[in-house]
Amino acid sequence: MAGFKQLSGLVVPLDAANVDTDAIIPKQFLQAITRVGFGKHLFHEWRYLDVDGTKPNPEFVLNYPQYQGATILLARKNLGCGSSREHAPWALADYGFKVMIAPSFADIFYNNSLNNHMLPIRLSEEEVEEIFQWVWANESKQIHVDLEAMTVTVGDKVYTFELDEFRRHCLLNGLDNIGLTLQHEDKISAYEKNIPAFLR
């Protein structure tokens, strides 16, 4: 898994609070257990005018031409509330989002996003409002996220954010739970060699 250090990308301004995981990925699309293929169903009930997902809703922000190819999602408070389905960050990642910015995230969704190598950034409501206003006034312009410096640069303004150092280390180095374990492979092997034969 590639490490995440910096990203310059388009921002989709999803002007909604309390966006729950059922809105992010509706329950009828949860049958699969692999992480791919969910992007086409992201925000399905808002994004499409029909059940089959063949008629895009022109009034939904993800369908606006100026936001195609966006890699950063901007939202209001309590993003990812509701059920704890891990399919929600899977769908966001499969669509192409790498960063989410909001005043707050539901705890399980926040951790699931980090586990799936996405960066959820918490900024104050005032800072998020400033970014919304900038994005609306500067459509099709990119912002810059720097995980090493822990900053978000929007136009000529720089915002700082916080992230647990362990989580930051994992993102910077592209480490998931398996990768973290393999960092200690030599110690695991040494321990296993000392296990009595009758316990192996």
UniProtKB/Swiss-Prot annotation:
Reaction catalyzed: (2R,3S)-3-isopropylmalate = (2S)-2-isopropylmalate
GO CC list: 3-isopropylmalate dehydratase complex
Gene3D superfamilies: Aconitase, domain 4 (3.20.19.10)
Amino-acid biosynthesis keyword on record: yes
A single GO molecular function term of this UniProt record: 3-isopropylmalate dehydratase activity
Domain of life the protein comes from: Bacteria
One Pfam family it belongs to: Aconitase_C
EC numbers for this chain: 4.2.1.33
InterPro entries, A to Z: 3-IsopropMal_deHydase_ssu, Aconitase/3IPM_dehydase_swvl, AconitaseA/IPMdHydase_ssu_swvl, IPMI_Swivel, LeuD
Transmembrane segments: none
Stated role: Catalyzes the isomerization between 2-isopropylmalate and 3-isopropylmalate, via the formation of 2-isopropylmaleate.
HAMAP family, alphabetized: LeuD_type1 (MF_01031)
Membership in a protein family: Belongs to the LeuD family. LeuD type 1 subfamily.
Identification of the protein by name: 3-isopropylmalate dehydratase small subunit
